[in-house]
Amino acid sequence: MAGSPSRAAGRRLQLPLLCLFLQGATAVLFAVFVRYNHKTDAALWHRSNHSNADNEFYFRYPSFQDVHAMVFVGFGFLMVFLQRYGFSSVGFTFLLAAFALQWSTLVQGFLHSFHGGHIHVGVESMINADFCAGAVLISFGAVLGKTGPTQLLLMALLEVVLFGINEFVLLHLLGVRDAGGSMTIHTFGAYFGLVLSRVLYRPQLEKSKHRQGSVYHSDLFAMIGTIFLWIFWPSFNAALTALGAGQHRTALNTYYSLAASTLGTFALSALVGEDGRLDMVHIQNAALAGGVVVGTSSEMMLTPFGALAAGFLAGTVSTLGYKFFTPILESKFKVQDTCGVHNLHGMPGVLGALLGVLVAGLATHEAYGDGLESVFPLIAEGQRSATSQAMHQLFGLFVTLMFASVGGGLGGLLLKLPFLDSPPDSQHYEDQVHWQVPGEHEDKAQRPLRVEEADTQA
């Protein structure tokens, strides 16, 4: 391994060069392919003689604002629990999301809205891009503290492409319904990140174990992320559902599911906690599992009771996962899941997909009436039975797991390339490796950073 000067020079050049290249290439592609859609273009909109009040901006933008806040504030602050990694948690979330939303606009545009030689964008494409960024940030949670920014940008470059392809296969080729992304966002993002983490397994991570925990104020800041996500999750699930009853029902189901998952989390956390005390890790994360578990079925006729039951189940399963399964995941399967994305997004995402299979299989014309067309158009048109739709939903889950697993494996191999800057084993979960930290000179005088230390990878 090169010594400190060459390593510092490489770190100085890698990130700016990659950022400039990615932004430059994206800008060129935007110039060539991206155009306003008919609801955004001045000439096209006014030529159609619509009232301004009919523009989709007024129906979709409030949801977009909520989704945007979730991505940049909710996800960012949820990950600041690490005692010495707050700058990186929020800062790299900012960086990844800013790149992912541009790149996903292109990838999703080529797959979903490419006609006349151009990609046509509007507020719905902004929401879809944020959804994709959310999946990338979920994967980031699995490798938080163990990767550098250049590695993360390359991860996003690959993951956005696979996310777009998986989404296209599920929604357009298989006709799967997944309004809130239990499969396309949460399951995909979680298992992509978990497989990536397995490939990047660091057997000497014990050297940084003392930084992997939280302190009082870092947990408090992380709780800000939890509250933002909890408040805005109904908008997240409902952002792109059919206007009217469908969107209303989606928000309602998510609202009740989140409430039930919160009570389930508090109950289980106290039950399995030491001396009956609550664990803030459980509250920060498992309380949100209710939003994940109804992602697929929230626009369906789940019923308020069904939403409560699903949320409570997700909260309990997620809490038990944090308590018992995360240690097994690392010790037995060599998956170092920093944020526990398997418990918040992975297992609840799979449960949500299976719940969607069940609710889709129970769909009838009597239950949905004329609303069947907006929720299950293929059933309404007579092209599928409810049972067939349920089977397609189940197959969509397997397709998602396949794309996520293969993609995570490829991503891990990409990120292990020796010339990419990666923090040494003794400096994981440490902001000073990548950031100018206030007071770092005094800290270095006591504990100098050994940036020249060789990396150890399996």
Curated annotation (Swiss-Prot):
Q: How does it sit in the membrane?
A: Multi-pass membrane protein
Region span, Interaction with ANK3: 416-424
Output a single Gene Ontology CC term carried by this record.
Answer: plasma membrane
PTM per UniProt?
Answer: N-glycosylated.
Which residues, renumbered to this chain, are glycosylated? N49
- Keywords (A to Z) from UniProt: Ammonia transport, Cell membrane, Glycoprotein, Membrane, Transmembrane, Transmembrane helix, Transport
The record describes its quaternary structure and partners as: Interacts (via C-terminus) with ANK2 and ANK3; required for targeting to the basolateral membrane.
Described purpose of this protein according to its UniProt entry:
Ammonium transporter involved in the maintenance of acid-base homeostasis. Transports ammonium and its related derivative methylammonium across the basolateral plasma membrane of epithelial cells likely contributing to renal transepithelial ammonia transport and ammonia metabolism. May transport either NH4(+) or NH3 ammonia species predominantly mediating an electrogenic NH4(+) transport. May act as a CO2 channel providing for renal acid secretion.
Q: Where in the cell is it found?
A: Cell membrane; Basolateral cell membrane
What name is this protein filed under? Ammonium transporter Rh type B
Q: What is its main location?
A: membrane
Region: Disordered; residue ranges are: 436-458
Taxonomic lineage of the native organism: Eukaryota, Metazoa, Chordata, Craniata, Vertebrata
> Which residues face the membrane's Cytoplasmic side?
1-13, 83-86, 146-149, 202-219, 273-282, 326-346, 415-458
Residue stretches spanning the membrane: 14-34, 62-82, 87-107, 125-145, 150-170, 179-201, 220-240, 252-272, 283-303, 305-325, 347-367, 394-414
Q: What is the effect of changing D421A?
A: Partial loss of interaction with ANK3. Intracellular retention
Residues in the Extracellular compartment per record: 35-61, 108-124, 171-178, 241-251, 304, 368-393
- What does it catalyze? NH4(+)(in) = NH4(+)(out); methylamine(out) = methylamine(in); CO2(out) = CO2(in)
Tissue expression: Specifically expressed in kidney. Also detected in liver and ovary.
GO molecular function ontology, one term from the record? carbon dioxide transmembrane transporter activity
The record's similarity note reads: Belongs to the ammonium transporter (TC 2.A.49) family. Rh subfamily.
The processes (GO biological process) annotated in the record are: ammonium homeostasis; ammonium transmembrane transport; transepithelial ammonium transport
